[in-house]
Each structure stands twice: as structure tokens, then as C-alpha cells.
A protein has these predicted regions:
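Hydrophobic alpha-helical core bundles mediating ligand binding, dimerization, or RNAP-core interactions
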Residues: 17-22, 36, 126, 147
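Active-site rim helix/loop that mediates acceptor-substrate recognition in acyltransferases
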Residues: 26-57, 61-67, 82, 87
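Conserved GNAT acetyl-CoA-binding A-motif
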Residues: 97-98, 119, 126-139
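Conserved acetyl-CoA-binding loop-helix of GNAT-fold acetyltransferases
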Residues: 105, 111-124
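Conserved beta-strand-loop-alpha-helix junction that forms the acyl-donor binding cleft
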Residues: 105-110, 134-145, 158-162
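C-terminal "cap" of GNAT-fold acetyltransferases
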Residues: 141, 149-151, 156-187
């Protein structure tokens, strides 16, 4: 049963994403579903999700943020739980400062190559746009391991018990492409 990218997400999908996040993170690290939905509703490139047999299998939030928010994230002084629509930058505001807010695959759908599929779909809208860099804020050891596998550099601990990572956009794209040419592990 292959995973398929969901062409148009609904508020219910965002509620399902929030429920999936709660399996891994405390609520203090999660942007409420209604707020994430508001980003997507105005900026549909901000979130990509996939399903298997009608069940949410995973998702990625990758989107441009205002330069001041990027710097606050980078410095470890902004918890994206408090991210609001006004913090998301329109893709016309270039160059783009990207934030990889979350990438999560449900445990039962791991080892299917879904991370690669989600990242490829998430990168597509930005392919021809000038992006400066990408920052991520990792709450778990698995998140830190993901960031390191994908070539991010650990910058510092945040003021909200997480780790901040960053890399150039060009490097991130190359690392995603490199990892996408490696076949998924056998089950």
C-alpha cells in the first residue's frame, strides 16, 4: 500500500497532524491545528501530507518566515508553538528565509521512503525561488538525528529546551536529493 500525497488538506487533516505530533511532543512545542491551518489556507505550499489507505501517514511543514522570525528561531529565542500567520512570509518576499517546522511520519508507516517522498514534494514549490537558508528547532533526539543526517549544523540550545540547527538552502536541497537517490531500506 503506497503512500499518496494529499492534494488539498482540510482542517481535519491538521487536527490529525496535531494528534500525531502529540504522540511525540508535549503540547508546549506544537502549534495548534487551527493556527497551522490558517498558514496553509493562505500559503498552501507550507504543508505537505501523505496518507495510506485514507489514514494520515506523515507530514512536513516547510515554509518561509519573516527575516526577524528566522533570526529569532536561529538564536533559539522563538518557540514555534507561538508561530502565527503574520510570521509566515509570502513567497513573493524574496529572498526566502525557510523554516523546517516539523517532519513526522507515523511509526506504522516508517521505512517506506515516506520521508523522502514528503521532502521532495515540500521542496517543489520553492525550486525556482531564491532561498537563503533553512533553520529547524528539534525537541527530540530523533529530530536531532534527522537534522544531522540531512546535513544541518547544530547551532545552540534554545531557551525552550530544544536544539537549533541550520544549513544553507542549497545544501539542504542537495542533501535531500542525495538521500532520495538512496533506495528505502527493506522492511
Amino acid at each position: 500500500m503506497p503512500a499518496t500525497i494529499i492534494p488539498r488538506l482540510t482542517l481535519q487533516h491538521f487536527r490529525d497532524m496535531e494528534a500525531l505530533e502529540l504522540q511525540f511532543y508535549d503540547a508546549e512545542f506544537i502549534t495548534p491545528a487551527e493556527e497551522s491551518w490558517s498558514w496553509y489556507d493562505l500559503h498552501p505550499h507550507s504543508t505537505v501530507a501523505a496518507e495510506v489507505d485514507g489514514k494520515l501517514a506523515g507530514f512536513v511543514n516547510l515554509f518561509p518566515v519573516q527575516p526577524a522570525i528566522y533570526e529569532a528561531l536561529r538564536s533559539g529565542q522563538f518557540n514555534d508553538h507561538f508561530m502565527e500567520l503574520e510570521h509566515v512570509a509570502p513567497i513573493t518576499q524574496q529572498p526566502l528565509h525557510m523554516f523546517l517546522s516539523c517532519i513526522l511520519v507515523d511509526r506504522q508507516f516508517r521505512r517506506m521512503g515516506l520521508t523522502r517522498q514528503l521532502l521532495q514534494a515540500a521542496l517543489r514549490p520553492y525550486a525556482a525561488l531564491p532561498c537563503v537558508g533553512v533553520v529547524t528547532d528539534n525537541v527530540t533526539a530523533d529530530g536531532c538525528a534527522f537534522s544531522e543526517r540531512y546535513g544541518f549544523t547544530r547551532l545552540r540550545p534554545s531557551d525552550h529546551d530544544s536544539w537549533i540547527y541550520e544549513q544553507s538552502w542549497e545544501s539542504f536541497v542537495k542533501n535531500c536529493e542525495r538521500r532520495s537517490t538512496t533506495p528505502p531500506p527493506a522492511n
